A protein has these predicted regions:
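Soluble metallo-hydrolase cores and metallopeptidase-like ectodomains found primarily
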Residues: 3-69
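Surface-exposed patches in mature extracellular/periplasmic domains of secreted proteins
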Residues: 17-21, 99-107, 260-264
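Generic recognition of flexible, low-complexity loop/linker segments
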Residues: 17-19, 58, 104-106, 202-204, ...
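A mature extracytoplasmic/lumenal domain signature
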Residues: 33-36, 75, 122, 190, ...
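Active-site/substrate-binding loop(s) of hydrolase catalytic cores
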Residues: 66, 80-237
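Active-site histidine-acidic residue metal-binding/catalytic motifs
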Residues: 71-78, 82
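Metallocarboxypeptidase
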Residues: 169-335
Length: 335
Protein backbone atom coordinates (compact mmCIF):
# COMPACT_ATOMS: atom_id res chain seq x y z
CA UNK A 1 0.00 0.00 0.00
CA UNK A 2 0.99 3.65 -0.15
CA UNK A 3 1.14 3.56 3.63
CA UNK A 4 3.78 0.82 3.38
CA UNK A 5 5.76 3.02 1.00
CA UNK A 6 5.52 5.96 3.42
CA UNK A 7 6.66 3.77 6.31
CA UNK A 8 9.60 2.33 4.38
CA UNK A 9 10.91 5.63 3.03
CA UNK A 10 10.46 7.13 6.48
CA UNK A 11 12.84 4.50 7.85
CA UNK A 12 15.62 5.18 5.32
CA UNK A 13 18.87 5.92 7.14
CA UNK A 14 21.64 4.79 4.78
CA UNK A 15 20.28 6.67 1.79
CA UNK A 16 18.28 9.80 1.07
CA UNK A 17 14.65 10.47 0.19
CA UNK A 18 13.26 13.28 -1.95
CA UNK A 19 9.73 14.10 -3.07
CA UNK A 20 10.30 14.63 -6.80
CA UNK A 21 6.67 15.32 -7.70
CA UNK A 22 3.21 15.67 -6.22
CA UNK A 23 0.40 13.92 -8.07
CA UNK A 24 -2.84 15.64 -9.12
CA UNK A 25 -4.40 13.93 -6.10
CA UNK A 26 -1.85 15.56 -3.79
CA UNK A 27 0.22 12.42 -3.20
CA UNK A 28 4.04 12.42 -3.06
CA UNK A 29 6.21 10.65 -5.61
CA UNK A 30 9.40 9.65 -3.80
CA UNK A 31 12.90 9.04 -5.11
CA UNK A 32 15.15 7.02 -2.81
CA UNK A 33 18.89 7.26 -3.49
CA UNK A 34 21.85 5.22 -2.25
CA UNK A 35 25.52 5.72 -3.01
CA UNK A 36 27.47 8.83 -3.93
CA UNK A 37 26.80 10.62 -7.19
CA UNK A 38 29.90 11.02 -9.31
CA UNK A 39 30.66 14.18 -11.26
CA UNK A 40 29.32 13.60 -14.78
CA UNK A 41 31.40 16.36 -16.41
CA UNK A 42 28.31 17.09 -18.50
CA UNK A 43 28.44 19.82 -21.12
CA UNK A 44 25.54 18.70 -23.34
CA UNK A 45 22.27 16.83 -23.18
CA UNK A 46 22.39 13.21 -24.35
CA UNK A 47 20.84 13.85 -27.76
CA UNK A 48 23.30 16.61 -28.59
CA UNK A 49 26.25 14.60 -27.26
CA UNK A 50 25.36 11.69 -29.55
CA UNK A 51 25.09 14.13 -32.45
CA UNK A 52 28.63 15.22 -31.54
CA UNK A 53 29.68 11.54 -31.86
CA UNK A 54 30.58 11.20 -28.17
CA UNK A 55 28.02 10.50 -25.41
CA UNK A 56 30.72 11.36 -22.86
CA UNK A 57 29.92 15.03 -23.52
CA UNK A 58 26.66 14.22 -21.67
CA UNK A 59 28.07 11.91 -18.97
CA UNK A 60 31.53 10.46 -18.58
CA UNK A 61 31.44 6.77 -17.70
CA UNK A 62 34.74 5.05 -17.01
CA UNK A 63 36.33 2.77 -14.43
CA UNK A 64 36.63 5.64 -11.95
CA UNK A 65 32.86 6.22 -11.83
CA UNK A 66 30.20 4.29 -9.99
CA UNK A 67 27.56 2.55 -12.15
CA UNK A 68 24.02 3.89 -11.76
CA UNK A 69 20.78 1.88 -11.71
CA UNK A 70 17.22 3.22 -11.87
CA UNK A 71 14.34 1.11 -10.56
CA UNK A 72 11.12 2.81 -11.68
CA UNK A 73 8.15 1.57 -9.68
CA UNK A 74 4.78 0.99 -11.29
CA UNK A 75 3.28 3.77 -13.39
CA UNK A 76 0.08 1.69 -13.40
CA UNK A 77 -1.40 1.67 -9.92
CA UNK A 78 -2.88 -1.83 -9.98
CA UNK A 79 0.50 -3.37 -10.85
CA UNK A 80 1.42 -3.60 -7.20
CA UNK A 81 4.11 -6.26 -7.48
CA UNK A 82 6.80 -3.71 -8.34
CA UNK A 83 5.92 -1.66 -5.27
CA UNK A 84 6.29 -4.77 -3.12
CA UNK A 85 9.63 -5.48 -4.75
CA UNK A 86 11.03 -2.00 -4.22
CA UNK A 87 9.80 -1.68 -0.63
CA UNK A 88 11.68 -4.91 0.05
CA UNK A 89 14.72 -3.74 -1.92
CA UNK A 90 14.92 -0.64 0.28
CA UNK A 91 14.74 -2.97 3.29
CA UNK A 92 17.60 -5.04 1.87
CA UNK A 93 19.66 -1.89 1.32
CA UNK A 94 19.01 -0.83 4.92
CA UNK A 95 19.18 -4.16 6.77
CA UNK A 96 20.50 -6.84 4.41
CA UNK A 97 17.22 -8.79 4.53
CA UNK A 98 13.77 -8.54 2.98
CA UNK A 99 10.57 -8.15 5.00
CA UNK A 100 10.29 -11.93 5.33
CA UNK A 101 13.57 -11.87 7.23
CA UNK A 102 15.36 -13.62 4.36
CA UNK A 103 18.95 -12.34 4.00
CA UNK A 104 20.26 -11.22 0.60
CA UNK A 105 23.97 -10.68 1.29
CA UNK A 106 25.12 -10.74 -2.35
CA UNK A 107 22.35 -8.38 -3.44
CA UNK A 108 23.24 -5.96 -0.66
CA UNK A 109 26.93 -6.17 -1.55
CA UNK A 110 26.15 -5.38 -5.18
CA UNK A 111 23.85 -2.51 -4.24
CA UNK A 112 26.74 -0.94 -2.35
CA UNK A 113 28.79 -0.83 -5.57
CA UNK A 114 26.16 1.32 -7.34
CA UNK A 115 24.49 4.66 -7.26
CA UNK A 116 20.97 3.31 -6.72
CA UNK A 117 17.80 5.22 -7.62
CA UNK A 118 14.35 3.92 -6.70
CA UNK A 119 10.91 5.40 -7.34
CA UNK A 120 8.74 3.00 -5.30
CA UNK A 121 5.40 4.19 -6.71
CA UNK A 122 5.39 6.36 -9.83
CA UNK A 123 1.59 6.72 -9.94
CA UNK A 124 0.32 7.01 -6.36
CA UNK A 125 -3.09 8.28 -7.53
CA UNK A 126 -3.72 5.08 -9.44
CA UNK A 127 -2.50 2.96 -6.55
CA UNK A 128 -4.80 4.79 -4.12
CA UNK A 129 -7.84 4.09 -6.31
CA UNK A 130 -7.11 0.37 -6.65
CA UNK A 131 -9.11 -1.51 -3.98
CA UNK A 132 -6.86 -4.60 -4.12
CA UNK A 133 -3.45 -4.97 -2.47
CA UNK A 134 -2.80 -8.18 -4.44
CA UNK A 135 -4.42 -10.09 -7.29
CA UNK A 136 -3.08 -13.50 -6.28
CA UNK A 137 -6.01 -15.90 -6.72
CA UNK A 138 -8.28 -13.12 -8.04
CA UNK A 139 -9.81 -13.39 -11.55
CA UNK A 140 -7.86 -11.46 -14.16
CA UNK A 141 -11.12 -9.80 -15.23
CA UNK A 142 -11.32 -8.13 -11.81
CA UNK A 143 -7.79 -6.80 -12.23
CA UNK A 144 -8.74 -5.48 -15.66
CA UNK A 145 -11.83 -3.76 -14.26
CA UNK A 146 -9.87 -1.74 -11.74
CA UNK A 147 -6.67 -1.48 -13.75
CA UNK A 148 -7.87 -0.23 -17.12
CA UNK A 149 -11.27 0.93 -15.85
CA UNK A 150 -14.83 0.83 -17.18
CA UNK A 151 -17.25 2.85 -19.24
CA UNK A 152 -20.37 4.30 -17.64
CA UNK A 153 -22.38 1.23 -18.69
CA UNK A 154 -19.94 -1.01 -16.82
CA UNK A 155 -18.19 -2.50 -19.85
CA UNK A 156 -14.43 -2.89 -19.55
CA UNK A 157 -11.99 -0.73 -21.47
CA UNK A 158 -9.44 -3.52 -21.28
CA UNK A 159 -6.13 -3.67 -23.11
CA UNK A 160 -5.37 -1.98 -25.45
CA UNK A 161 -8.74 -0.20 -25.40
CA UNK A 162 -7.74 1.78 -22.30
CA UNK A 163 -5.11 3.50 -24.45
CA UNK A 164 -7.61 4.65 -27.08
CA UNK A 165 -8.79 7.61 -24.95
CA UNK A 166 -6.09 9.82 -23.45
CA UNK A 167 -6.34 11.66 -21.17
CA UNK A 168 -9.01 9.24 -19.96
CA UNK A 169 -12.21 11.28 -19.58
CA UNK A 170 -15.84 11.35 -20.69
CA UNK A 171 -17.38 7.89 -20.80
CA UNK A 172 -15.83 6.73 -17.53
CA UNK A 173 -17.53 4.63 -14.86
CA UNK A 174 -14.43 3.52 -12.94
CA UNK A 175 -11.28 5.49 -13.66
CA UNK A 176 -8.67 2.77 -13.98
CA UNK A 177 -5.51 2.67 -11.91
CA UNK A 178 -3.56 3.03 -15.18
CA UNK A 179 -4.21 6.75 -14.81
CA UNK A 180 -3.46 9.51 -12.35
CA UNK A 181 -6.34 11.63 -11.10
CA UNK A 182 -6.11 13.78 -14.25
CA UNK A 183 -6.59 10.72 -16.44
CA UNK A 184 -2.95 10.60 -17.59
CA UNK A 185 -1.25 7.26 -18.20
CA UNK A 186 2.45 8.08 -17.59
CA UNK A 187 3.55 5.22 -19.84
CA UNK A 188 2.06 7.03 -22.83
CA UNK A 189 2.42 10.69 -21.92
CA UNK A 190 3.62 13.28 -24.46
CA UNK A 191 7.30 12.98 -23.63
CA UNK A 192 8.38 16.08 -25.54
CA UNK A 193 5.72 18.09 -23.70
CA UNK A 194 4.64 15.98 -20.70
CA UNK A 195 1.13 16.41 -19.36
CA UNK A 196 1.89 14.89 -15.94
CA UNK A 197 4.26 16.22 -13.29
CA UNK A 198 5.06 12.60 -12.42
CA UNK A 199 6.35 12.00 -15.95
CA UNK A 200 8.43 15.17 -15.95
CA UNK A 201 9.97 14.21 -12.60
CA UNK A 202 10.96 10.73 -13.76
CA UNK A 203 12.55 12.05 -16.95
CA UNK A 204 14.35 14.76 -15.00
CA UNK A 205 15.70 12.14 -12.60
CA UNK A 206 17.07 10.08 -15.47
CA UNK A 207 18.48 13.16 -17.20
CA UNK A 208 20.34 14.26 -14.06
CA UNK A 209 21.60 10.84 -12.99
CA UNK A 210 22.54 9.15 -16.32
CA UNK A 211 21.70 5.57 -15.25
CA UNK A 212 23.57 2.71 -16.89
CA UNK A 213 20.45 0.56 -16.68
CA UNK A 214 16.79 1.33 -15.97
CA UNK A 215 13.73 -0.84 -15.55
CA UNK A 216 10.09 0.20 -15.70
CA UNK A 217 8.24 -2.29 -13.49
CA UNK A 218 4.88 -3.58 -14.72
CA UNK A 219 2.69 -6.66 -14.26
CA UNK A 220 0.38 -8.88 -16.32
CA UNK A 221 -1.33 -12.24 -15.94
CA UNK A 222 1.26 -14.20 -17.94
CA UNK A 223 4.67 -15.50 -16.80
CA UNK A 224 7.29 -12.87 -15.96
CA UNK A 225 9.34 -11.50 -18.84
CA UNK A 226 11.46 -8.63 -20.09
CA UNK A 227 10.04 -6.56 -22.95
CA UNK A 228 12.21 -4.78 -25.47
CA UNK A 229 12.05 -1.00 -25.71
CA UNK A 230 10.91 0.39 -29.07
CA UNK A 231 12.81 2.94 -31.13
CA UNK A 232 16.15 2.46 -29.40
CA UNK A 233 19.48 1.38 -30.96
CA UNK A 234 19.82 -2.26 -31.97
CA UNK A 235 22.93 -2.70 -29.80
CA UNK A 236 20.80 -1.77 -26.76
CA UNK A 237 18.16 -4.29 -27.79
CA UNK A 238 20.89 -6.92 -28.01
CA UNK A 239 22.00 -6.10 -24.48
CA UNK A 240 18.41 -6.33 -23.26
CA UNK A 241 18.09 -9.73 -24.96
CA UNK A 242 21.26 -10.91 -23.23
CA UNK A 243 19.94 -9.78 -19.85
CA UNK A 244 16.64 -11.55 -20.56
CA UNK A 245 18.49 -14.82 -21.16
CA UNK A 246 20.31 -14.42 -17.85
CA UNK A 247 17.12 -13.65 -15.91
CA UNK A 248 15.36 -16.65 -17.48
CA UNK A 249 18.23 -18.92 -16.43
CA UNK A 250 18.24 -17.44 -12.93
CA UNK A 251 14.52 -18.13 -12.54
CA UNK A 252 14.85 -21.67 -13.86
CA UNK A 253 17.42 -22.40 -11.14
CA UNK A 254 14.69 -21.88 -8.51
CA UNK A 255 11.73 -23.23 -10.53
CA UNK A 256 10.20 -19.85 -11.35
CA UNK A 257 8.48 -19.41 -14.73
CA UNK A 258 9.62 -17.04 -17.46
CA UNK A 259 8.02 -16.01 -20.73
CA UNK A 260 9.66 -15.53 -24.10
CA UNK A 261 13.12 -14.09 -24.62
CA UNK A 262 12.44 -11.24 -27.05
CA UNK A 263 15.01 -10.96 -29.83
CA UNK A 264 16.09 -7.56 -31.19
CA UNK A 265 13.90 -6.41 -34.06
CA UNK A 266 13.39 -3.35 -36.17
CA UNK A 267 10.30 -1.32 -35.33
CA UNK A 268 7.34 -1.04 -37.71
CA UNK A 269 8.89 -2.48 -40.87
CA UNK A 270 5.41 -2.56 -42.40
CA UNK A 271 2.85 0.28 -42.45
CA UNK A 272 1.08 0.81 -39.14
CA UNK A 273 2.52 1.93 -36.92
CA UNK A 274 1.91 -0.51 -34.09
CA UNK A 275 4.98 0.07 -31.91
CA UNK A 276 4.80 2.99 -29.50
CA UNK A 277 7.53 5.32 -28.27
CA UNK A 278 6.66 4.96 -24.60
CA UNK A 279 8.18 5.95 -21.26
CA UNK A 280 10.80 3.21 -21.51
CA UNK A 281 11.90 4.55 -24.90
CA UNK A 282 11.98 8.08 -23.52
CA UNK A 283 14.20 7.03 -20.62
CA UNK A 284 16.80 5.86 -23.12
CA UNK A 285 16.63 8.96 -25.26
CA UNK A 286 16.95 11.36 -22.33
CA UNK A 287 19.89 9.56 -20.69
CA UNK A 288 21.34 6.84 -22.92
CA UNK A 289 20.33 4.20 -20.40
CA UNK A 290 19.75 0.53 -21.13
CA UNK A 291 16.01 0.81 -20.52
CA UNK A 292 13.50 -2.02 -20.59
CA UNK A 293 10.07 -2.96 -19.32
CA UNK A 294 9.67 -5.87 -16.94
CA UNK A 295 6.31 -7.62 -16.69
CA UNK A 296 5.86 -9.52 -13.45
CA UNK A 297 2.96 -11.91 -12.90
CA UNK A 298 -0.05 -10.85 -10.86
CA UNK A 299 -0.73 -14.45 -9.84
CA UNK A 300 -4.31 -13.88 -10.99
CA UNK A 301 -6.72 -16.50 -12.33
CA UNK A 302 -7.12 -16.60 -16.11
CA UNK A 303 -6.47 -18.62 -19.25
CA UNK A 304 -2.91 -17.31 -19.65
CA UNK A 305 -2.22 -16.75 -15.97
CA UNK A 306 0.94 -17.86 -14.22
CA UNK A 307 0.01 -19.29 -10.83
CA UNK A 308 2.48 -17.62 -8.47
CA UNK A 309 2.35 -17.21 -4.71
CA UNK A 310 3.17 -14.01 -2.86
CA UNK A 311 6.57 -15.44 -1.90
CA UNK A 312 7.34 -16.35 -5.50
CA UNK A 313 6.36 -12.88 -6.72
CA UNK A 314 8.78 -11.29 -4.28
CA UNK A 315 11.53 -13.68 -5.41
CA UNK A 316 10.77 -12.78 -9.04
CA UNK A 317 11.32 -9.12 -8.20
CA UNK A 318 14.46 -9.40 -6.08
CA UNK A 319 16.17 -11.89 -8.40
CA UNK A 320 15.54 -9.54 -11.32
CA UNK A 321 17.14 -6.65 -9.46
CA UNK A 322 20.14 -8.77 -8.51
CA UNK A 323 20.65 -9.96 -12.07
CA UNK A 324 20.46 -6.40 -13.38
CA UNK A 325 23.27 -5.39 -11.05
CA UNK A 326 25.36 -8.43 -11.97
CA UNK A 327 24.91 -7.74 -15.66
CA UNK A 328 26.11 -4.15 -15.43
CA UNK A 329 29.08 -5.05 -13.24
CA UNK A 330 30.17 -7.59 -15.84
CA UNK A 331 29.16 -5.73 -19.02
CA UNK A 332 29.27 -2.01 -18.32
CA UNK A 333 29.49 0.37 -21.27
CA UNK A 334 32.20 3.00 -20.91
CA UNK A 335 31.95 6.38 -22.68
Amino acid sequence: TLEDVDTEVGAVRRGSVETIAVSPGGRPVYAVRYGEQDELHSQANYNSAVAAKNPAWYARKDATTRPVVLFLGPVHGQEVEGIVGLVNLIHVAETGADHRGRPWPELKRRLEQFRVLMVPSANPDGRARCPYDSFVGVPTRTMTKYGQGTRKDGTLYGWPGAKSVHPMAGDVGILGAYFNDDGINPMHDDFFLPMADETRAVLRLAREEAPDIAVSLHSHESPPMILQASYVPVFMKERIRDLSVRVKERYEEVDLPYGDVREPRFDDETPGPTRSFNLTSALHHVSGTMAFTFECSHGSLGERAASLTHDQILDVQLLLYDEMLRYVLENRLYW
